[in-house]
Every structure is written in C-alpha cells, then in structure tokens.
Amino acid sequence: MYALVWTARFTRSAKKFADRHGELRTKFSNILRDLENDPFQPHLKYHHLGGKLKGIQAVSITDSYRISLTVAITDKEIILLDVGSHDEVYR
C-alpha cells in the first residue's frame, strides 16, 4: 500500500477538476484508491514522461484526462502533482 501525498497545486487542480467534471468524480476517486493499492496496475496506464517533464510519471483517468505524479518507491509514497486534461497536465 502506498501513501498519497497531496501537494498544494494538486489540491487546487483536483477541486477545479471535480467542479468542472462532475461526471468523472467517481472515476477520479477510484483511480486515487487504485493508486494507493498499486500504481502499476495496467488499467492506470502508468507511464514516465520525457522532455521538460523527465522524472515525472502520469496515469490516465480517461483518454483525455491525466494525473501527473512522482512515485518514491523506497518510501512507498506517491506525490500527486497535477490533474487535468492532457494539455493542462503536460504544459
């Protein structure tokens, strides 16, 4: 089991995301629960980012929406960085 660490930025973007996309609230909550259990589950589509975002990972909520994060495997922590559309998260 991993501990989810909510950054201030993630907290703001998660609230905005939930307000704008009420239809995805349940899916978003389920993704966070699944991340806590095992971030490497295939349906999360966990992947490493490159370029200016090297060192950051992401998981998919849907084809259009992502959560960016950093996984500290030794500490069993997942540091949540941002949530939003593909373009918002990868800016």
Feature names for model-found ranges:
Residues M1-Y65, A72-I79, E88-R91:
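Basic, Lys/Arg-enriched alpha-helical interface segments
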